[in-house]
C-alpha cells in the first residue's frame, strides 16, 4: 500500500523539480503586492527621517525657527507713523499730479525777462504758488486736493487692511495718473477726464503705449523705476511691521471673543464709511448746491467748465476729474416707458408726414451754415447805452427782409457751449436739472451716440456731409472729442492738423477776424460738389474788450452816462460789432455769387459781460438775455427772400433754430423736427436764465410768448403743457433714458 501511495503522490521536492522542468509560469500573489505597497510609506518615512537628520536640514530648521521667533518679536509700527507717512505720501501725490499740468515757459527773448519773473513762471514757481496761495490769498485748493486724495488713500487702507500694501498701491495709481495726465496735456492740451476711461473698458488698453511720445519716455521709465523700488520698500516694511492688519480682523472665527467682534465691526464700519464718503463726494461734486459742491467752494474751488485744462490747472486735476465723473442730467418723467415713447413716436410720425406732404424741398438740397457769432448783440438795445452811430446797420437792414428776430440766451458773458449745444441738438438746457451747467463737459462725454442735426447731411452724403470751423483751440469745451461724436468729418482750429487755413487778425486784436473765418467757410463750399452742414464758431468779439482797433469812432459816438471804465469796454466792443456787421454783409454778398443753394443760420450766443450797470437792474433781466439772429438764403436757393411771420420767428431760443430753418426753407422734417416745430409754436422761447453776470445759466426758467412776454409755466395752455411734457420725454430718452427713439425712425427725414 505504501508503495502504491508513494507512486501516486510524489514528494514536494520531486514535484517542484518536475514543475521547474515543465517551466510553468508563476502566478503573482495579491498578498505579495499588498505587502510591498505597505512598505512604501515606511520607506518614505525612513528616508525623510534620514534627510531631516542631515546637517543642512538641521541648520535650515534652526534658521526658520530663528526667523519665526524674530518675526514674532517684530515691533508694531505706531498709528502715528501711519498718519505721518500718509500725509507725506498724499502731499507728494498732490504735487506730482499738479506738476503734470505745468510746463517750463519759453521766451522769445530770454534776456529781456528778469530772473524773478522766470522763477515765478517756472514749474517750481507755479507749484510753489499753488501751495503758498493758502497763506497769500486764503485759497485752499491745494488742501482740497490733499483731502480728496486722502479719501482715496483711506479707502485703500481700510479695504486692504494692510497699510504698506495700500501705500504702494496708492503711489502706483497716483503716479500713473500724473504721468498719463502730463502726456495728454502735452499732446492735446487737455487733462485726463472720466470719459477717457472708456478707452480702457473698450478693450483698447493695449494701445496706450503707442501714444507715448519719445520725449516722454524718460519720464515713463523713471516713474516705473521709482515705483518698483517703492513697492519693494513697502513690501519689506509690511513684512517687518508687526502690525499685520491696520484694524484687527478675523475671517475664520469672527465671533471668537469680544475683542474679535469689536475688531471685525470696526473694520467693516471703517470700510463702509470711507467708501461712502468718497462716493458721496464724487457723486455730488458736480451738482450745484450739494454738500460737496459747497464744501469744495468753501476751500477755494472755482469751477471753470469752459476749459478742462484751465479748471484742472486752477482747481487741481483730481478735483477737476471728479467734478466731471457725475452730473445729474434730469429726473425721469413719471410716464416714461417703452409704450409711451412708441405712442409718442407714432403720433409725431403721422404729423410729420402731413407736414411733409405740403413741403417741396429737402434740407439736404441746400448747404446749411450755422454761425455762432461770439458775443454778437446790439449794444443800442441795452438800457443806459447811448450811441450816436448804429454799430450794425447792415444786419438791421437785413432783418427787415429775411427771417429774423431775437434769441433768448441762457447766459451773459459766458456759456457759449450751452447755446451751441442747444442749436446742434435741439435739446434745451432748461429741461435739464439745474445742476447741469455744461452739457459739453458733463453730458456728451458720457453719451455713446448723441444725435445732432448735421447727421441729416451725413446720412445723405456720408462722413463728408458735415464739417466744423473754430478759429481758436480745439479742446475748448471739449469740442474736438464732442464733434467727433457728433459726426463732423473734421474740426478745423488753430491747433488742428491741418490747422484752419485763414487766420488773419484785425489791428492788434488777439483773435482771428470774422472775415477770415468766413473765408474758410467759402472755401469749403466752393471745394465740395455736394451740399453739406457747416458749423462755424467765431472768436472776433470775444472778451476782453481792450483798445484793439484803430480809428474807433465809437469813442466819440458814445454819449452814455456811465463810468469811463465801463464806457471804454462798451466802445471797444461796439467797434468789433461794427466790423462783424460789415464782414457779415460781405460774406452774404459772396454767397449770393455762389451758384449753389446756401442757407445761413446766424446768431449771437450771449451779450458780453461789460454791462455792469444794466445787469444790476433786475428789470433788465430779459433784455440782457436777448441777442439778434437771422436765417437767410442766397439767390440760388428756392427760399431766397423768405421771411417768416414775426409771430412765428420774432422770439426764439437756439434749440428751435433747425426747426425754423426747415420752415424757412419749406423743407421736409423728421418726427423730431416736427415736435420742435409744434413746441415752438406754443412756447416760442424757453431758457434757463442766469442768476448773476458772467454766469452759465443756473437760475430760473423763462418761457416767452410770441410777443416776447414772460409767461409762468402754470399759465401755459393745456396744449403747451402737453407739448412740453412730450419734449421732456424725448429729451430724457435722448440724454439719459433707454434710447427707445433711436430705433424708431424718429430722427429720420422721409
Role assignments for model-derived ranges:
Residues 197-200, 314-318, 338-341, 392, ...:
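Alpha-helix initiation and N-capping motif
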Residues 356-359, 372-373, 378-750:
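Solvent-exposed soluble domains appended to multi-pass membrane proteins
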Residues 181-196, 334-337, 493, 513, ...:
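A diffuse structural propensity rather than consistent per-protein peaks
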Residues 1-54:
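N-terminal targeting leaders characterized by basic, low-complexity, disordered sequences
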Residues 282-370:
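Membrane-interface segments at or immediately adjacent to transmembrane helices
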Residues 38-308:
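Transmembrane and membrane-interface helices of multi-pass
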Residues 135, 363-365, 594-596:
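Short hydrophobic "helix-edge" motifs at membrane interfaces and signal-peptide entry regions
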Residues 47, 54, 290, 312, ...:
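Serine-centered coil/turn micro-motif
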Amino acid at each position: 500500500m505504501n508503495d502504491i501511495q508513494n507512486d501516486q503522490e510524489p514528494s514536494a521536492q520531486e514535484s517542484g523539480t518536475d514543475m521547474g522542468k515543465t517551466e510553468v509560469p508563476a502566478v503573482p500573489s495579491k498578498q505579495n503586492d499588498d505587502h510591498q505597497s505597505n512598505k512604501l510609506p515606511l520607506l518614505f518615512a525612513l528616508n525623510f527621517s534620514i534627510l531631516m537628520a542631515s546637517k543642512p536640514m538641521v541648520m535650515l530648521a534652526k534658521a526658520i525657527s530663528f526667523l519665526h521667533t524674530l518675526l514674532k518679536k517684530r515691533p508694531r509700527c505706531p498709528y502715528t507713523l501711519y498718519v505721518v507717512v500718509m500725509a507725506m505720501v498724499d502731499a507728494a501725490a498732490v504735487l506730482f499730479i499738479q506738476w503734470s499740468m505745468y510746463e517750463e515757459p519759453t521766451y522769445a527773448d530770454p534776456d529781456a525777462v528778469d530772473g524773478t519773473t522766470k522763477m515765478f513762471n517756472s514749474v517750481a514757481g507755479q507749484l510753489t504758488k499753488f501751495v503758498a496761495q493758502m497763506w497769500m490769498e486764503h485759497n485752499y485748493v491745494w488742501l482740497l486736493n490733499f483731502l480728496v486724495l486722502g479719501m482715496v488713500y483711506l479707502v485703500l487702507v481700510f479695504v486692504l487692511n494692510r497699510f504698506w500694501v495700500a501705500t504702494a498701491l496708492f503711489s502706483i495709481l497716483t503716479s500713473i495718473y500724473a504721468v498719463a495726465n502730463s502726456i495728454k496735456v502735452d499732446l492735446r492740451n487737455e487733462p485726463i477726464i472720466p470719459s477717457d476711461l472708456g478707452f480702457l473698458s473698450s478693450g483698447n488698453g493695449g494701445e496706450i503705449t503707442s501714444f507715448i511720445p519719445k520725449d516722454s519716455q524718460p519720464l515713463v521709465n523713471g516713474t516705473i523705476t521709482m515705483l518698483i523700488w517703492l513697492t519693494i520698500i513697502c513690501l519689506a516694511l509690511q513684512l517687518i511691521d508687526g502690525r499685520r492688519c491696520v484694524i484687527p480682523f478675523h475671517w475664520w472665527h469672527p465671533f471668537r471673543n469680544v475683542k474679535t467682534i469689536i475688531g471685525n465691526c470696526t473694520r467693516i464700519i471703517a470700510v463702509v464709511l470711507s467708501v461712502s464718503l468718497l462716493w458721496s463726494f464724487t457723486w455730488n461734486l458736480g451738482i450745484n448746491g450739494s454738500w460737496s459742491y459747497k464744501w469744495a467752494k468753501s476751500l477755494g474751488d472755482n469751477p471753470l467748465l469752459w476749459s478742462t485744462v484751465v479748471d484742472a490747472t486752477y482747481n487741481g486735476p483730481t478735483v477737476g476729474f471728479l467734478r466731471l465723473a457725475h452730473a445729474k442730467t434730469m429726473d425721469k418723467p413719471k410716464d416714461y416707458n417703452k409704450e409711451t415713447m412708441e405712442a409718442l413716436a407714432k403720433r409725431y410720425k403721422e404729423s410729420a408726414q402731413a407736414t411733409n406732404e405740403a413741403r417741396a424741398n429737402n434740407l439736404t438740397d441746400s448747404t446749411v451754415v450755422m454761425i455762432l457769432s461770439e458775443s454778437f448783440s446790439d449794444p443800442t438795445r441795452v438800457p443806459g447805452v447811448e450811441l450816436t452811430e448804429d454799430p450794425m446797420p447792415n444786419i438791421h437792414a437785413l432783418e427787415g427782409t429775411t427771417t429774423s428776430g431775437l434769441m433768448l440766451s441762457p447766459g451773459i458773458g459766458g456759456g457759449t457751449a450751452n447755446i451751441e449745444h442747444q442749436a446742434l441738438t435741439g435739446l434745451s438746457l432748461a429741461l435739464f436739472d439745474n445742476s447741469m451747467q455744461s452739457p459739453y463737459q458733463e453730458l456728451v462725454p458720457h453719451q455713446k451716440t448723441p444725435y445732432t442735426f448735421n447727421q441729416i447731411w451725413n446720412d445723405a452724403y456720408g462722413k463728408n456731409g458735415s464739417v466744423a470751423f473754430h478759429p481758436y483751440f480745439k479742446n475748448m469745451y471739449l469740442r474736438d472729442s464732442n464733434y467727433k461724436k457728433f459726426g463732423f468729418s473734421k474740426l478745423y482750429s488753430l491747433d488742428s492738423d491741418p490747422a484752419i487755413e485763414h487766420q488773419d487778425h484785425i489791428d492788434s486784436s488777439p483773435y482771428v477776424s470774422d472775415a477770415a473765418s468766413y473765408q474758410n467757410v467759402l472755401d469749403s463750399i466752393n471745394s465740395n460738389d455736394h451740399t453739406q452742414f457747416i458749423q462755424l464758431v467765431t472768436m472776433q468779439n470775444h472778451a476782453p474788450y481792450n483798445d484793439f482797433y484803430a480809428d474807433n469812432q465809437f469813442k466819440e459816438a458814445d454819449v452814455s452816462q456811465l463810468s469811463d471804465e465801463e464806457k471804454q469796454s462798451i466802445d471797444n466792443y461796439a467797434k468789433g460789432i461794427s466790423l462783424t456787421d460789415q464782414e457779415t454783409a460781405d460774406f452774404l454778398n459772396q454767397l449770393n455769387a455762389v451758384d449753389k443753394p446756401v442757407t445761413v443760420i446766424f446768431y449771437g450766443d450771449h451779450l458780453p459781460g461789460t454791462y455792469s450797470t444794466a445787469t444790476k437792474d433786475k428789470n433788465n433781466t430779459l433784455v440782457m438775455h436777448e441777442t439778434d439772429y437771422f436765417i437767410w438764403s442766397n439767390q440760388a436757393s428756392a427760399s431766397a427772400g423768405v421771411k417768416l411771420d414775426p409771430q412765428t420767428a420774432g422770439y426764439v431760443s437756439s434749440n428751435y433754430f433747425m426747426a425754423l430753418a426747415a420752415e424757412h426753407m419749406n423743407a421736409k422734417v423728421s418726427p423730431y423736427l416736427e415736435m420742435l416745430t409744434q413746441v415752438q409754436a406754443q412756447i416760442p422761447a424757453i431758457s434757463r436764465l442766469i442768476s448773476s453776470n458772467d454766469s452759465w445759466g443756473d437760475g430760473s426758467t423763462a418761457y416767452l410768448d410770441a410777443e416776447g412776454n414772460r409767461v409762468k409755466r402754470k399759465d401755459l395752455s393745456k396744449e403747451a403743457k402737453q407739448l412740453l411734457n412730450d419734449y421732456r420725454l424725448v429729451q430724457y430718452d435722448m440724454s439719459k433714458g433707454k434710447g427707445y427713439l433711436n430705433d424708431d425712425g424718429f430722427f429720420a427725414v422721409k
